[in-house]
Amino acid sequence: MQETLIFILKIKDVRIIIIELQYTVFLIKLQYGTAENPAWKHRKGMVTEMKILVINAGSSSLKYQLIDMDGEVVLAKGNCERIGIGGKITHKTSDGRVIAKEVDMHDHAAAFAEVKAALTEGEGKVINDLSEVSAIGHRIVQGGSKFDHSVLVNKQVIQDIADYASLAPLHNKAHVQGINAAIEAFGTDVPQVVVFDTAFHQTMPPKAYMFGVPYRYYEEYGIRRYGFHGTSHRYVSQRCLELLGKPDGKGTRLISCHFGNGSSVTAIKDGKVIDTTMGLTPLDGFMMGSRSGAVDPSVVTYIMEKEGLTPHEMDQLLNKQSGMLGISGVSSDDRDIAAAVEAGNERAKLAWNMRTYEIIKYIGGYIAALGGVDALIFTAGIGENQPDLRAEIIRTFEFYGMKLDEEKNKVHGVETEITTPDSSVRAFVIPTNEELVIARDTKAIIEGKAL
């Protein structure tokens, strides 16, 4: 402790000194705990009222929700955009108040200052004081092979998240910035929990997560299938099990379809993931808004040679210029694609048909891998709001006993069973709620409960 303080005091920037001192004290409290520390009182279940601040820190954004865990009610939510390049915060309360303003946010710490002000001051005020925030839960995209469940933040956890940045450079670096900014903004008495998108997929067997490249690349660099959208797949699959009357998951076979601008399909047996479409990165799987999905690896090297592209340029092409956008030439937004299809745009039709065909192949393969399927789940922006795509998928599997209820399938963003009562396989639209999963995990961990 003394050596740390001496080192810090040599730094001339006062702000850095304060941050480092807070951080050191925070880590000591996390490691040892004290009877009078409110954070540890939370963890011991001594708090009756609990409000959780859920954070999703991106490279230039910070999304948040404040959730009152008594009734699991969202008190307010918002988004800080264009961090480092100007700034805008949009803050919405549960009773309909909306506050939007341009404000300079040069880093995530400045963004947190705006979040604090939005929650406690002015027209968007929902709490009287920051002391009402019991804990903070962070969404983390990449947790590697190490994390198969959510954990309390400590020094090693932060370092591990930073170390996995090579597998998710745009995300994990921002997550670390978000955690450190939260420590600065809320002090050391507010415990923090991290919830990993990859954790739910850690039950996959090696035959599903290994790639057919030399084994040493797995040993040396962690090259394997990790899967993403795990928090979403976890929420909707657990909700589906409740609807099936089998909350423990035993004897069940589910296929969860998270369709958004980024999309993935996951096979779940007995409540545990056995396979998923995304791989080392969120680029794998079927064609998405601007992502290529799986392609012959030789296509990559061939284009690089022909175009003289660097690895970074090729990565940008596959992630930002491909998929529905690249094929249609119209947009990466599914609503624009649907409108273009309706207007007779042939390339938009091709993009639509390619994606649908690829999805159907994955679902069919997962039915075989599961040895059958009890229920199909549709979630996320497209899955919850695109009846035509859902209908096309279900009709394809009529031979397997899926029967679409045309009227119920017209639903947008509302939990609904969209198959008929005599369908041998049930299909549901289940709106996802990743923030609630993060809040629930955060509450459980600081109360000392097992996940």
Where are these regions (language model features)?
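Extreme N-terminal starter segment of soluble prokaryotic enzymes
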Residues: E49-L53
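Short glycine-rich, Thr/Ser-proximal phosphate-binding strand/loop in the N-terminal lobe
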Residues: S61-M105
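Phosphate/pyrophosphate-binding loops at sites that engage ATP/ADP/AMP, CoA/4′-phosphopantetheine
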Residues: A118-V133, C240-D248, I363-D374
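Short beta-strand-loop/turn "lid" adjacent to the catalytic site in phosphate-handling enzymes
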Residues: L119-H171, P191-V193, A199-A208
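Glycine-rich phosphate-binding loop of actin/hexokinase-like ATP-binding domains
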Residues: F200-M304
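Glycine-rich phosphate-binding loops at beta-strand->alpha-helix junctions
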Residues: G260, D374-F397
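Adenine-nucleotide phosphate-binding core of ATP-dependent small-molecule kinases
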Residues: G323-I327, D334-A369
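Conserved phosphate-binding/catalytic loops in two-lobed NTP-binding clefts
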Residues: P387, A391-E434
